Amino acid sequence: MKSIKYYIQKMLGNWLHEPIIPAEKTTGFSLVRSERSETNMGKNANAVAPYYLHNVQLGDYSYLAKNAQVANTKIGKFCSIGPNFCSGLGVHPTNGISTHPKFYRGEMVEYMPVSIGNDVFIGANVTVLDGVTIGDGTVIGAGAVVSKDIPPYAIAVGCPIEIKRYRLTEKQIAAMERIQWWNWDEEKLKNIRTMFNDIDGFIKKYDV
């Protein structure tokens, strides 16, 4: 017979991780409860609680590890995003008397959308600033602050962000962008597993 302790833990766990749909955009973040508003989750997409999501599109099979704080961000398909991810949370002016929104709210642009492509891998503790575009197939190293656009299939790290190299050659990148395997149906996606390490063979077969 299960103990009373088990049922108490189960009850508390369900309560702590119960999603909340706020009436309007919230400005805080709870370490134990999750908040989601104006957010679309694709097929088999997942966000691990706790999280704060506002005006987010999370593509098919993409996931956010715990403690994500994301707003005004479009995330493509098959993205793998590590814990403590922050994106699109707004900008503060630095050329005025104050940086506090009390003095400029409604008078200027506070948010600019973020776009993250497909098949993007983002490590732990990464922050993406407003208005940034991250291309398909990109890798962002842990702890990076992404303050500028990152082209497809780049490997970028650091603060300030710096492109170290590219995952593929220029010709391979162009071919992958034409193939767009992330838009395939379930049956066709099985071919990626069978050809996983044969990039040139994969391109030769499907870049037609």
Question: Language-model segments: which ranges?
Answer:
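Conserved beta-strand-loop-alpha-helix hinge in the C-terminal portion
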Residues: 154, 162-175
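Gly/Pro- and small hydrophobic-enriched strand-loop and loop-to-helix capping segments
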Residues: 149-153
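Domain-scale signature associated with acetyltransferase and cell-envelope carbohydrate enzymes
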Residues: 1-119, 126, 170-208
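Beta-rich strand-turn-strand
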Residues: 125-138, 144-148
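Residue-level marker of beta-strand positions
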Residues: 61-63, 78, 119-121, 137-139, ...
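Short coil-to-beta-strand initiation/turn motif
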Residues: 68, 85, 128, 144-146, ...
